[in-house]
């Protein structure tokens, strides 16, 4: 959980914290490049996703939300939700679809899925004490740990979360092989216990965000950060945006649609589009990128950390800035 997302929560999460890290280690594989941006506040906070989700549900219930468990949506017709395991029907004025990257409910609502989904795999592993001690000092990202992607090593209470993601899906993807190779690069040769899960991350937004009285938000909308594939921050932001839209629209559907699209196109879409372009440069043009990071990597790491903190956004004049830096890079050679 990066700081920009954590500070959007108006409640304490200490009860589920598994670690806080003020420093991030960023490596570029096979290059003599290592950056360690550091801040006074926790850049990244570690939580287990099931504990985090449970806390979110508990807080929502405290504000009057009703939780329906084991209630798989079977169909949506004219604003009426029907369920697979009961005869219950619910008529809703607004249906907010926030069911994650695969988003089966958006399919039932008739949304076309034009998002780019990138594959990732993560292992929760218990390692010998000396390995855990060595790797538990900071959060670590390794660029090029997988082709056209990166790896991560996140220390938790008593284990490590190690994974890889690939941001260019045209290449043949062997996630398990990439992750096993990455673990060897980390010096992990003995694993006491492990559990693995694969998943996809949507890094481009849908063209259509509203259909009838259905609104998609978060990963269901394709709002994950295209550069680092982090989705919780924009999920929280888009949740706040739709809540504001419903309130400011005075429960009127057309006004709510207008408000939601207006706010999303102002606060989210422009930065996502810039992020997509920057990710393409960063992960696909590795030769030029490596020259760039040799000279300006420290500055780029500091700027990315400011984005993690919610203090900055990706630059709207990124083309101009990249061109200037690239000219300086080649004139320096």
Where are the regions that the model predicts?
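A short, flexible beta-alpha/helix-coil linker loop
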Residues: 41, 160, 221-223
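Conserved N-terminal helical subregion
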Residues: 15, 19-20, 26-108, 117-118, ...
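Conserved FAD-binding catalytic core of PHBH/FMO-like flavoproteins
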Residues: 102-175
């Amino acid at each position: 959980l990066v700081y920009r997302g954590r500070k959007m929560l108006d409640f304490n999460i200490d009860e589920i914290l598994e670690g806080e890290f003020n420093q991030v280690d960023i490596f570029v594989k096979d290059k003599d490049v290592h950056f360690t941006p550091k801040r006074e506040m926790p850049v990244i906070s570690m939580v287990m996703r099931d504990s985090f989700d449970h806390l979110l549900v508990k807080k929502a219930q405290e504000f009057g939300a009703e939780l329906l468990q084991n209630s798989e949506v079977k169909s949506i017709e004219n604003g009426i939700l029907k369920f697979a395991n009961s005869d219950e029907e619910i008529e809703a004025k607004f249906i907010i679809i926030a069911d994650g990257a695969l988003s089966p409910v958006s399919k039932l609502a008739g949304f076309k899925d034009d998002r780019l989904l990138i594959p990732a795999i993560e292992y929760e592993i218990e390692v010998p004490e000396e390995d855990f001690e060595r790797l538990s000092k900071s959060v670590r990202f390794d660029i090029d740990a997988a082709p056209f992607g990166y790896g991560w090593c996140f220390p938790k209470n008593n284990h490590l979360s190690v994974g890889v993601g690939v941001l260019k899906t045209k290449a043949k993807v062997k996630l398990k092989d990439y992750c096993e190779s990455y673990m060897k690069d980390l010096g992990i040769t003995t694993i006491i216990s492990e559990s693995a899960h694969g998943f996809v991350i949507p890094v481009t937004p849908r063209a259509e965000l509203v259909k009838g009285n259905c609104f998609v938000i978060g990963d269901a909308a394709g709002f994950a950060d295209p550069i680092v594939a982090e989705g919780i921050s924009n999920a929280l932001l888009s949740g706040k945006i739709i809540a504001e839209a419903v309130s400011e629209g005075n429960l009127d559907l057309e006004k709510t649609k207008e408000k939601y699209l207006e706010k999303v196109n102002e606060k989210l879409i422009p930065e996502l589009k810039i992020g997509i372009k920057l990710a393409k440069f960063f992960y696909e043009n590795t030769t030029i990128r490596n020259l760039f990071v040799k000279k300006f990597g420290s500055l780029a790491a500091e700027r990315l950390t400011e984005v993690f903190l919610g203090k900055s956004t990706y630059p709207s004049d990124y083309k101009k800035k990249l061109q200037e830096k690239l000219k300086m890079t080649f004139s320096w050679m």
